[in-house]
Amino acid sequence: MAPGQMPHQPAPWRGTHPLFLLSPLMGLLSRAWSLLRAPGPPEPWLVEAVTEADQGGAGLEDEAKASLATYHALWGRHPQEETKDSGAAEEDREASPGACPNLEAKHSLPEAWGLSDDDDEKYGGEEATGVPREQKEFMDGQPAPLPLSLLIRSLPDLPGEEESKEEAVTGGGGNEVTAFSFPLSHWECCPGEEEEEEEENGEAVRVCRPVNGATEERTQTEAATKTSMSPSSVGSHLRAWECCSGKESEEEEKDKQAEKGDADPGPHFTSLAQRPSLRTWQHPSSAITEEEEDRDSEEMGASSSVPLTSAFLSDWVYQPEDTEEEDEEEEDCDSEATEDEGEAEVSSATPPPSAFLSAWVYRPGEDTEEEEDCDSEATEDEGEAEVSSATPPTSAFLSAWVYQPGDTEEEEDCDSEATEDEGEAEVSSATPPPSAFLSAWVYRPGEDTEEEDEYEDEDNESGAADLGPSPSLQTQSALLRDQIYQPGEKTDGGEAAEKWGEAESCPFRVAIYLPGEKPPPPWDPPRLPLRLQRRLKSAQTPTRHQDLERLLKTRKVRFSEKVSIHPLVVWAGPAQAARRGPWEQFARDRSRFARRIAQVQEELGPYLTPAARARAWARLGNPPTSLATVPAPTQTSPMTPIQATPLSHALASPSPPCVSPSLDLSGRRG
């Protein structure tokens, strides 16, 4: 093998293709792409394979060669491969005549679409092993093209033309001819059904055509079904791929069962297993009949390893045409299946999920009592059977969490009975019955009626003992009772009067005092409503008594005779910094100014007297008239030597008469 060549490994079409078939977007895109590319080259899935036994008809050979030449020119194939392929086809035809081995071994339906798997060799039978595997997969290092015996048509022809060509082909040879006509694209869900026609010479021709879905008439002989194994397998594959547009008749079902009984069960095992799983994904325009479901269940019963996917997917897929009766029948079937599994003690990997999914998936006709009874019976049967299943009964668990508008007291009774049966049974389930736990958390519309009344009655009985020793609280509550008006005061007032042993009080009373008559007794103090009284009894009365006792004990203030000093232990720096502020500076300035004022007054006080002023003017030589007339006062206070020195000096040294006072004042200090 060359280094650049890799073996052709086809994709596992059985596991992946049904998911692609379900995608409506891919189908729409492939349909649009096939319509756009209709004038261009054909796609691999647009091939119509027609195999001839004797390769008769030169016109067909020429047409096949021309179409193959265009196909090779577009897809990069070499004409050398054609000769090899034709030679291989002739050898295969000589090795196993009469069974179309070339179509079965090299170009069966999955391989024609490019979706074959490695396991397809087993389903072809002994006749499908005529060509070696290397020759099937590689021709000169490349995938083998279609042989010359296969007619390639680029565009689909009319049904009438196809029938005429098929008649011409069958008239030329004496062997069986198998023809396949595929839709424009393998993605579209075009109804294709098998149809068999019996010619005059007794030869059977099998054609796969797209039909609109009426009934099928099959007149195939037993010899034809035994000799041709691949058409039946291909038919079963095509049956799994198609989407039915109408109902199948009972004759078709009987013919299918007869063919499947004659054929080998080995190669058809996977196709039978795939059919119910694929049918559940389909959305037919009309509902599937009950006979088909029974037939599928019988086929699935033959192989225990295949899980019950029809019941699993039917709960998730919503079909608008299903009625309440069909839903009830399906649920009855599911409950019977669960009962059979519980009695047989079969530990299946996939348990029946109808009970689990029915609680989550909503259907239009679900809220009925029959379904609830069915669920309760299923849970009871599971509790009675001693089976340790991995999936416990979840209907009681989910019904407590999920709120449904039609929940009534009957559902609660059913849940309680189911939990009691589960408690009595010896089932080791991982999840205990949580209905009792969840019922306390989940709110339901009719819950707060009887339970609250019972709880309030218990509180009232327990609080009657607390109300006895405190009459003041009774009077206060009664006072508030008359002041507050409630719409239901009549019934509450009557109950309160019976409890307190007093007559019913009128809603409105007027006191009229007449002179000389005895005044009426005082009115009864008003009472609180019963709900408030219960709350006061349960919560407020014990706390109030404790508070009152504490207040009575700690009301009087006492001072001790011993005085104790507790020095404040602080740091010196932070304490001084806390005491500093602007007021300290103001105090310092105030004291400094007062000290300066006192000093100046002591020094300048004697010089400001009138006698000192007169002497000063006399010394200057021109005393004023006011000062001359005023006699000099006697010196009462002794003078300091500092003050007396300049005066004595001034008197001892007379000043010259011609000196101006300005110069005299400027040159002396005194």
UniProtKB/Swiss-Prot annotation:
Intramembrane segments per UniProt: 22-39
Any one GO biological process: response to endoplasmic reticulum stress
Processing after translation: Phosphorylated on tyrosine by LYN; which impairs its antiproliferative activity. Polyubiquitinated. Exhibits a rapid proteasomal degradation with a half-life under 1 hour, ubiquitination depends on endoplasmic reticulum association.
Region (Disordered): 76-144, 159-178, 191-501, 622-670
Biased composition (Acidic residues): 191-202, 289-299, 321-344, 367-385, 407-425, 448-461
Start-end of Polar residues biased regions: 271-288, 302-312, 388-397, 623-645
Bilayer disposition of the protein: Peripheral membrane protein
Any one cellular-component term (Gene Ontology): endoplasmic reticulum
Role: Recruits the serine/threonine-protein phosphatase PPP1CA to prevents excessive phosphorylation of the translation initiation factor eIF-2A/EIF2S1, thereby reversing the shut-off of protein synthesis initiated by stress-inducible kinases and facilitating recovery of cells from stress. Down-regulates the TGF-beta signaling pathway by promoting dephosphorylation of TGFB1 by PP1. May promote apoptosis by inducing TP53 phosphorylation on 'Ser-15'. Plays an essential role in autophagy by tuning translation during starvation, thus enabling lysosomal biogenesis and a sustained autophagic flux.
PANTHER family found in the cross-reference section: GH11727P (PTHR16489), PROTEIN PHOSPHATASE 1 REGULATORY SUBUNIT 15A (PTHR16489:SF14)
Designated name of the protein: Protein phosphatase 1 regulatory subunit 15A
Biological source species: Bos taurus
Lineage: Eukaryota, Metazoa, Chordata, Craniata, Vertebrata
